[in-house]
């Protein structure tokens, strides 16, 4: 059973509907105790890094997540802002500490790229590692992105990259911790396949 963490950061319903389409049992976790009854966790999110961390703290999710992920070793998937929160720090609205599951930081796309910010739309993945999330998904497949910030971290954690002015991290994996910068719930059949792969872990 997959807990979708509700910390007032959007796109929960679309993720829940995507899991329903593939027959994966899920529920909305509205408080930290709810995480105990799940065998997998999902941290969605759209919006500001700083505001999201503030909400997680106020709702009591930060310590609960660290317990469930780092001690209990439950698989977790972070989507978009959810992925970014896994890092040590972000710079949206000033320096802000993240969950620290993965070493690295979250920075904004440079303004001088002559590209529209946010990066919005379909983009091709360069899959670098055959991780469980990409089982049955071909390299150069397209997924849907909406973001103004991107992750900088060690290559050892990067499972895929995409290109927008320069190459950036499209997905991460560190042991049982998985994350995508793109939105699988908005990425049609391939996105459903990725969510199915996570549900089957």
Swiss-Prot record:
InterPro entries with a match to the protein in the record: Class_I_gatase-like, GATASE, Imidazole-glycPsynth_HisH
Catalytic site positions: 80, 183, 185
EC numbers on record: 4.3.2.10, 3.5.1.2
Pathway: Amino-acid biosynthesis; L-histidine biosynthesis; L-histidine from 5-phospho-alpha-D-ribose 1-diphosphate: step 5/9
Protein's cellular compartments: Cytoplasm
Main location: cytoplasm
Keywords: Amino-acid biosynthesis, Cytoplasm, Glutamine amidotransferase, Histidine biosynthesis, Hydrolase, Lyase
The reaction(s) this protein catalyses: 5-[(5-phospho-1-deoxy-D-ribulos-1-ylimino)methylamino]-1-(5-phospho-beta-D-ribosyl)imidazole-4-carboxamide + L-glutamine = D-erythro-1-(imidazol-4-yl)glycerol 3-phosphate + 5-amino-1-(5-phospho-beta-D-ribosyl)imidazole-4-carboxamide + L-glutamate + H(+); L-glutamine + H2O = L-glutamate + NH4(+)
Function: IGPS catalyzes the conversion of PRFAR and glutamine to IGP, AICAR and glutamate. The HisH subunit provides the glutamine amidotransferase activity that produces the ammonia necessary to HisF for the synthesis of IGP and AICAR.
Subunit composition and interactions: Heterodimer of HisH and HisF.
Name by which UniProt lists this protein: Imidazole glycerol phosphate synthase subunit HisH 1
Organism: Campylobacter jejuni subsp. jejuni serotype O:2 (strain ATCC 700819 / NCTC 11168)
Classification lineage: Bacteria, Pseudomonadati, Campylobacterota, Epsilonproteobacteria, Campylobacterales
């Amino acid at each position: 059973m997959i807990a979708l963490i509700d910390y007032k950061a959007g796109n929960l319903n679309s993720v829940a509907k995507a899991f329903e389409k593939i027959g994966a049992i899920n529920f909305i976790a509205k408080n930290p105790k709810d995480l105990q009854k799940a065998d997998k966790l999902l941290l969605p999110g759209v919006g500001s890094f700083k505001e999201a961390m503030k909400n997680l703290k106020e709702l009591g999710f930060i310590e609960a997540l660290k317990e469930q992920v780092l001690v209990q070793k439950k698989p977790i998937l972070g989507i978009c802002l959810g992925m970014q929160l896994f890092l040590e720090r972000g710079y949206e609205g000033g320096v802000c500490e993240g969950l620290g599951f993965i070493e690295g930081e979250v920075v904004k796309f440079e303004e001088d790229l002559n590209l529209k910010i946010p990066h919005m739309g379909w983009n091709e993945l360069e899959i670098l590692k055959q991780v469980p999330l990409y089982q049955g998904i071909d390299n150069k497949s397209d997924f849907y992105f909406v973001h103004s910030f991107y992750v900088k971290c060690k290559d050892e954690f990067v499972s895929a990259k995409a290109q927008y002015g320069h190459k950036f991290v499209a997905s991460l994996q560190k042991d049982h911790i998985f994350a995508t910068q793109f939105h699988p719930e908005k990425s049609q059949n391939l996105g459903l396949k990725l969510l199915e792969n996570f549900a089957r872990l």
